[in-house]
Amino acid sequence: MDWSHLWLYVSPPVLGGIIGYFTNDIAIKMLFRPYQAIYIAGRRVPFTPGLIPRNQERLALNISKTIMGSLLTPQELQNLARRLLQTERVQAAILWLLRLAIEQINTEKNEKSAKIVAGILRDLLGESLPRLLKVLARREDFLEAQINQIFDQILLEFQLSEEQATRLADWLLEVVLPPDMLRQAIVDFLTDRTIQIIDEGFREKTSGTYWVVANLFGLRNTLTRLRTFCLDEKEATNNRLQELTQDLQIRERIRKFLQNLSLQNLPMGTVRQLRKTTRESVRHYLQNSGSDFLQGLTDSVDWENIAVVLLNRLSTSSVVSTSLEVMSQELALILDKYLEKDLEIIVAQAIPILSIDQVIVDRVKSTSPADLEAAIEGIVKNELQAIVTLGGVLGFVIGLLQTVFLVLSQY
């Protein structure tokens, strides 16, 4: 062997290794380069642009079909939806939305929310509730337990205290029945006709000594003089009535009467009948006039201010904060039951809406050949480096075999 021709034996494995190592990069570049068609004398040069840029639309369709047929099948999408919509994740999302809504109300305090809540309250009390009451009030047992409870616990046990009875007695004697009012009542009562009836009745129905007095003297003159005195001597009459009120202890008698006034002192049968009458009266009132009452109440209430107060109270209420987790958990369970039953149908309906295949096609078509080339080269360098190395090894081995054959051919 002529060692002066050593390069003939060394070059095949070296060149084979180099070619094998860089073949992948060269092949990738040949697939993409050139990016644009090249024209000479108005005619397109063959193999321009590269294979992938020239068939990018068809490549996009094939990639979309491959992904949708092998990777993103309906079953895989259902599994993906199940993992995404796990109860814990759904609960966390709902809880986040509820807290976000509360925070939004806290930060904005806007009039729009107040108007919405005010409209709901106005419709509930002014429209929905009256219609509901009118229907429910037709039932014989409507509010029976509630009215009986109010009657037994409040009305039946209600009794004026000593101070309340004293003030009520003072009000009756000073405002309702003052001396001047009593004097005028006496004058109005003692008409000529009334005096005649009293006198005749006294004469006819008395006997013994009273008969003698009635027929000799009678009551006509006495009652007439009393009426005349009340008309002519108003101040004196008022003073006399005031003295009689004090001497007869009318104030104290009224106070004791009012203080002892209680439904518990009535017979049991009367109490039961009164309770039944109260219940029927309330039911008939709600049935006949409840709608008008609620409508008038609705018109007189400033619902926007109430809505603002309600929103402020809810935003700072600890009950609302603690109940958000319970609400989110219950809503998540309801959604989980619904998805468990209809997830397949939902996914089947969602696939055409999402148009995942068209998204893939549009994305591949809109990506420039240079970006596609860079992406594939990145995958080869990061994930397929072993193939590149293996290409270099195979090239080196093939070149080495050529050297062996060359050496053997010398002998």
UniProtKB/Swiss-Prot annotation:
Q: Name one GO cellular component term.
A: plasma membrane
Primary location? membrane
Its placement in the membrane is given as: Multi-pass membrane protein
The protein's matches in Pfam families, at most eight in alphabetical order, are given as: DUF445
Which keywords belong to this entry?
A: Cell inner membrane, Cell membrane, Membrane, Transmembrane, Transmembrane helix
- Where is this protein localized, as stated in its record? Cell inner membrane
- Per its UniProt record, what InterPro entries does this chain match? DUF445, UCP032178
Record field: transmembrane: 3-23, 387-407
State the source organism's domain of life. Bacteria
Q: Which family does it belong to?
A: Belongs to the UPF0754 family.
Identify this protein by name. UPF0754 membrane protein Npun_R4433
Task: Give the species.
Answer: Nostoc punctiforme (strain ATCC 29133 / PCC 73102)
Q: What is the lineage of its organism?
A: Bacteria, Bacillati, Cyanobacteriota, Cyanophyceae, Nostocales
